[in-house]
Structures are given as C-alpha cells and as structure tokens.
Amino acid sequence: MTDHTLADADEGFDLDSVEIRVLGVLMEKAFVTPDNYPLSVNAIVTGSNQLTGRDPVMNLTETEVQEALDRLIARKLVSKRDQASARVGKYEHLVRLRHSLPPPEQAALATLMLRGAQTAGEIRQRSERMHRFDDIAAVDKVLEHLGEKYPPMVAAVPKAPGTKETRYAHLLGGRQAFVQMGEAVASGYGSGGAVRGRTSELEEEVRRLRDEFDVLRSEFEKFRSQFE
C-alpha cells in the first residue's frame, strides 16, 4: 500500500514492541488523564516505563520513544499537536479514527497492548479505568468484534496444558509476534506458572460469581419494589 496504515492487507499488522507500547500509552492516557492529554514525549516515556499495569516492564529512552512516535506519525496513527502556548509539542493517537474503534474496543485493545495476553475477566478488571464493562459477556462481544476486523486485531491464544480459561492477545505485532506470545504464555505454566494460572482462574471465578450475585440482587430489588 502506498498509504501506510496500521496494517498491510496481505501481511497483517507489523508494529514493533516500542511502537505498540507508545501507542498503547497514548490510548490509555486519553481515557484516564484527559485533562493532561495530548501527551508530551516525557509523559509518554513515563507512561511507557511504569512499573504497574505494564507487561513486560520496559525502560525506554526519550530517543526510542521519539523515534517510535515519528514512525507512528508516518503511519498516520499518531499526530503531533503544536500549541502556541506550549513549549513542547504534544502527541495524540488516531486509532479511533483510522480503524473506527468505539471506546469499549479501544479500552480492551489498549489493555492487551500494555499487559500482554489475558482472559476476558482480566481484561474487564484491568480496563476499568478506561471503560467499565457491565459483565464478561460484554468483553467477549468486544473481543469478537476486534477479531472480525480485517485484518483481525485480536485472537485467542492456544490454551496451555492445565488451563481452562481462554486468553486473548493483540495481533498488532504481526503473526510471528503473536505465535511467540502464545509460546511465552504456555512456557509460563511450569511449576510456578501453573500456580499463577490456577490463581488467575480462581480470581476469574470469584468475579463471575460476583457478577451473578449482582444480577440476582438487582432482580430481587425489582421484585421487592412491586410490593412497596
């Protein structure tokens, strides 16, 4: 394609790990810190290197972030906003416009970009500051939409031995990067990984039970209101 976009129609997505992190940070901060958005390069560096909410944790330099921003601008995924009152330029993502993603899809995709492969329950919990999903079914619907785009933006990772929950990963790094991510997920289920995986499944089950309880409580309140 002469017009560079996020994906090539034949080969799919091909962003590198730094581009994915930088773009994910811009998407996240647009939700959680709207008063400080768009972001300066320094703010993007800080967001990229956070110790929480990031997997893997990275230690990017200002130069690496700036070069990634330049490449993303060339792909028309990021724009630089120069303001007369600002001493430095600031950057904003264009994913919503380029790929017609509503807020729920942006939130789920950003969560996958910043934290790696996750279950639908984990995505729901971890994306809460960006978008509050009513239940896991709502997350499943969003993941389905992202997986049906052309080229697809999300896919299910093959289950590791001994796991029940399906994990999902973004496809923005290309098919090979997705395969490597799946292998990393599977290799994480050694002695310690299996325990972490089981813990995650139990946490997921607790969240499911809470969802069901909330539904039952809501139905009971509606029933009781008929007699008041």
UniProtKB/Swiss-Prot annotation:
<protein>
    <recommendedName>
        <fullName>UPF0502 protein AZOSEA09860</fullName>
    </recommendedName>
</protein>
<comment type="similarity">
    <text>Belongs to the UPF0502 family.</text>
</comment>
<dbReference type="InterPro" id="IPR036390">
    <property type="entry name" value="WH_DNA-bd_sf"/>
</dbReference>
<dbReference type="Pfam" id="PF04337">
    <property type="entry name" value="DUF480"/>
</dbReference>
<dbReference type="InterPro" id="IPR007432">
    <property type="entry name" value="DUF480"/>
</dbReference>
<dbReference type="InterPro" id="IPR036388">
    <property type="entry name" value="WH-like_DNA-bd_sf"/>
</dbReference>
